[in-house]
C-alpha cells in the first residue's frame, strides 16, 4: 500500500521510508511519524484547516451497530456510484473524493470494498451482499481479470484479498480464480532468495516491505482454505518465517515497514502494516503451534495500543501525511478486530477499540462523514477523499465482530 502519483504510480523508495506507495514526498508529520513513514507511500497531502475540538471519547455513549451501519450509509451517500449493468447484474465503484473527480485508486478501492464486506459480515443483508458484487464487477470492469501491468505487488495482493473475501460471501468461482491468478502472478515475479527470501514491493526490486508480505500471508492462507491446495499454506509460512526475524521486534511488538537491497530497515511501524501483521499471525495461528503466533499477535496489538496511539491506550494516531496512510486505521481496525474475536481477547482490547470507534463517530460532520483526525470535528466544506474518511466506518463496523 504505497502512495502514487496522478497516473497511479508510486515513487522509488527513499531513505527513512518504505512500506507505502504514491509519491514519497516528505511527510509533514509529527516526529513520531517522521521516523516511520515512507516505503510504500506515494504522495504527501496538505494539512487540513478547520478543526473544532471534540468531547473526549470517554464521555461519549458507546456506538451501536445501527450507528455503524448509518456511518456506512453516510459514506456511501457521498462516494458510492452504481454506473451501469454487468451482464445480468450491475457494476459500481467508489469515487476518489466528494467532488467525484475520478474513481478511487486501485488498492484503496479494494479496501473500501472490504469495508462493505465487513458490514455484510456483521449484518448480512441482501443489499450489502449485492453491493459487494456490484463493486467487484466495477473492479473487473476497470482493471480486467489479471493485473500484471500494476508494478506494485502489494496492490495486486490487496485486490486478491478483496476477491477472496467476496468469494466467501458469493461462492463465485470467478472471484476465486481472479484471486488465485493474481496471487500466483505476485509470487512468480516477487519472491526470490535475495535477502533470504520475501516478496519485493515493486517489480523494480528495490525493497522488500511489510505492506506486501504481511497481506500476502493473509491472501495465501485464504487461498489455502478456499482451495485445499497446501502449497498456498506453505507459501504463507515461508513468507512469515522470512518476515518475523527481519521486521518483528519481539521485545516490543513493533513491526518495521521496509528493507532496502542492502538489508537495512528504513521504515518503522504504521497502523496498516501493524494491522496486517496481526492478521497474518491470526491466519497462521490455528495451523502451527510453533512459533507462537498468538503471542506475536498479542504483542503487536499491545504495541499498537501503547505506541501507535496518541497516548498509551488512547486514540489511534492520525497518520495524515500521505494519501496511503490516511486510511491506515481502516485496515488496522479490520484485522485487529478479527484477531480479538478469534482469540477471545475482547476483555483486554475491546474497551480501547470501542473508545476509538466512539471518538471517531463523535467528530463526524453534518453529513455523517468522519475524517482520520479523530480529535477534531470533520470539515463540512473540504473536498474530502474517500480513503481518508474510511477508517472510522471500518472501526465502527468491525467492533461488531466481537461485541
Write out the residue ranges for each language-model feature.
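N-terminal secretory signal peptides that target proteins for export/translocation
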Residues: 1-22
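Bacterial Sec-dependent N-terminal signal peptides
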Residues: 28-66, 70
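CBM-like carbohydrate-recognition segments
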Residues: 59-115, 119-154, 166, 208, ...
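Structural signature of alpha-solenoid helical repeat junctions
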Residues: 108-111, 124, 155-158, 175, ...
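Extended ligand-binding groove/face enriched in aromatic
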Residues: 129-226, 230-237
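Active-site cradle of extracellular carbohydrate-active enzymes
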Residues: 213-216, 220-224, 232-281
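Oxyanion-binding "anion nests"
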Residues: 273-288, 293-309
Amino acid at each position: 500500500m504505497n502512495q502514487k502519483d496522478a497516473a497511479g504510480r508510486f515513487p522509488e523508495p527513499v531513505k527513512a521510508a518504505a512500506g507505502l506507495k504514491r509519491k514519497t514526498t516528505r511527510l509533514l508529520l509529527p516526529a513520531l511519524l517522521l521516523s516511520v513513514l515512507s516505503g510504500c507511500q506515494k504522495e504527501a497531502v496538505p494539512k487540513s484547516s478547520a478543526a473544532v475540538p471534540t468531547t473526549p471519547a470517554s464521555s461519549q455513549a458507546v456506538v451501536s451497530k445501527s450507528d455503524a451501519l448509518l456511518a456506512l450509509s453516510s459514506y456511501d451517500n457521498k462516494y458510492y456510484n452504481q454506473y451501469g449493468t454487468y451482464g445480468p447484474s450491475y457494476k459500481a465503484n467508489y469515487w476518489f473524493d466528494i467532488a467525484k473527480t475520478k474513481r478511487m485508486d486501485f488498492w484503496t478501492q479494494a479496501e473500501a470494498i472490504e469495508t462493505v464486506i465487513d458490514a455484510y459480515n456483521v449484518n448480512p443483508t441482501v443489499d450489502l451482499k449485492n453491493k459487494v458484487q456490484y463493486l467487484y464487477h466495477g473492479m473487473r470492469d476497470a482493471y480486467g481479470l489479471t493485473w500484471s501491468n500494476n508494478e506494485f505487488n502489494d496492490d495486486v495482493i490487496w485486490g486478491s484479498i478483496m476477491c477472496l473475501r467476496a468469494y466467501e460471501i458469493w461462492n463465485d468461482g470467478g472471484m476465486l480464480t481472479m484471486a488465485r491468478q493474481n496471487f500466483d502472478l505476485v509470487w512468480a515475479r516477487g519472491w526470490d532468495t535475495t535477502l533470504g527470501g520475501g516478496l519485493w514491493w515493486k517489480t523494480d526490486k528495490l525493497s522488500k516491505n511489510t505492506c506486501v508480505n504481511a497481506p500476502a500471508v493473509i491472501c495465501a492462507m485464504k487461498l489455502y482454505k478456499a482451495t485445499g491446495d497446501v502449497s498456498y499454506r506453505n507459501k504463507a509460512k515461508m513468507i512469515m518465517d522470512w518476515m518475523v526475524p527481519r521486521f518483528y521486534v519481539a521485545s516490543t511488538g513493533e513491526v518495521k515497514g521496509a528493507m532496502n537491497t542492502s538489508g537495512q530497515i528504513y521504515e518503522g511501524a504504521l497502523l496498516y502494516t501493524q494491522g496486517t501483521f496481526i492478521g497474518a499471525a491470526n491466519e497462521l495461528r490455528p495451523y502451527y503451534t510453533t512459533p507462537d503466533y498468538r503471542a506475536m499477535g498479542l504483542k503487536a496489538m499491545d504495541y499498537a495500543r501503547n505506541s501507535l496511539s496518541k497516548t498509551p491506550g488512547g486514540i489511534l494516531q492520525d497518520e495524515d501525511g500521505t494519501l496511503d496512510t490516511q486510511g491506515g486505521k481502516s485496515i488496522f481496525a479490520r484485522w485487529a478486530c478479527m484477531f480479538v474475536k478469534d482469540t477471545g481477547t475482547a476483555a483486554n482490547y475491546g474497551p480501547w477499540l470501542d473508545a476509538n470507534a466512539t471518538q471517531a463517530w463523535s467528530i463526524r460532520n453534518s453529513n455523517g462523514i468522519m475524517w482520520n483526525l479523530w480529535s477534531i470535528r470533520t470539515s463540512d466544506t473540504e473536498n474530502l477523499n474517500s480513503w481518508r474518511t474510511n477508517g472510522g466506518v471500518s472501526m465502527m463496523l468491525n467492533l461488531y465482530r466481537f461485541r
